[in-house]
UniProtKB/Swiss-Prot annotation:
Organism name: Mus musculus
Family: Belongs to the CD300 family.
Cellular component, GO, one term: plasma membrane
Keyword Transmembrane helix included in the entry's annotation: yes
Top-level division of the source organism's lineage: Eukaryota
SUPFAM superfamilies, per the entry: Immunoglobulin
Signal peptide range: 1-21
All ranges on the Extracellular side of the membrane: 22-188
Keyword annotations of the record: Cell membrane, Disulfide bond, Glycoprotein, Immunity, Immunoglobulin domain, Membrane, Receptor, Signal, Transmembrane, Transmembrane helix
Name of the protein in question: CMRF35-like molecule 6
Top-level taxonomy: Eukaryota, Metazoa, Chordata, Craniata, Vertebrata
């Protein structure tokens, strides 16, 4: 086809595409998916395009749409993470993008390949533009309350344990310390006690003898006699 014919055809195709109800291919104008998940887009076409191959392509420029995946009869066709399946019975075809990434966002086309060169690249009236948006996924919940940064760790079998303070009463006799028990069990300790105990008793007896009350020698009074102070 001569370039002049293409230039004349393109405005006509654009005008035809603006006529309400003239879209042989229709679909959602915008779709939104989440990173890591799958996104399906369903496009409809007219009955006269039932036997034609259906294409899902990414819009690269004003006149170029790079094919990503194309149907093969009614069987599913796949290219990497993108698959397409034609449903001739209800005149629709479905495109599925798996494991979405942020780079998958952009402008795509639901398109029907009618076999002519100028229509394969400039199919204004045999395609439908779909804007794909991809949003980041939500972070997994790890048991922390949003906003406070405090992790809450709990065991399903844990239970509250109440401890009572130690209470000491007058009737409670504290146990001897390990040092005291070791001293009492030492034979050297008892030998030392047996040697010093008589000396201690003798000194105590002498002290009591010196401090005993004295009787008055001149009388028979039973009262003790004290020196005048």
């Amino acid at each position: 086809m001569n370039p002049r014919v293409i230039r004349l055809w393109l405005p006509s195709a654009v005008l035809l595409s603006l006529v309400p109800g003239h879209f042989p291919v229709r679909g959602p104008s915008t779709v939104t998916g989440t990173v890591g998940e799958s996104l399906s887009v369903s496009c409809q076409y007219e009955k006269k395009l039932k036997t034609k191959k259906k294409i899902w392509c990414k819009w690269k420029s004003n006149v170029l749409c790079k094919d990503i995946v194309k149907t093969s009869a009614s069987e599913e066709a796949r290219n990497g993470r993108v698959s397409i399946r034609d449903h001739p019975d209800n005149l629709t075809f479905t495109v599925t993008l798996e494991n979405l990434t942020l780079e998958d966002a952009g402008t795509y086309m639901c398109m029907v390949d009618i076999g002519f060169f100028y229509d394969a690249y400039l199919q204004i009236d045999k395609s439908f533009k779909v804007e794909v948006f991809v949003v980041p996924g939500k972070p997994p919940f790890k048991g922390s309350r949003p906003g406070n940064g405090i992790n809450i760790l709990a065991s399903p079998t844990s239970s509250a344990v109440h401890t009572q303070p130690n209470v000491t009463t007058d009737d409670t006799i504290p146990a001897p310390s390990p040092e005291l028990r070791s001293l009492l069990s030492s034979p050297h300790f008892w030998i030392l006690v047996s040697l010093k105990l008589p000396l201690f008793l003798s000194m105590l007896g002498a002290l009591l003898w010196v401090n005993r009350p004295q009787r008055c020698s001149g009388g028979s009074s039973a009262w003790p006699c004290y020196e005048n102070q």
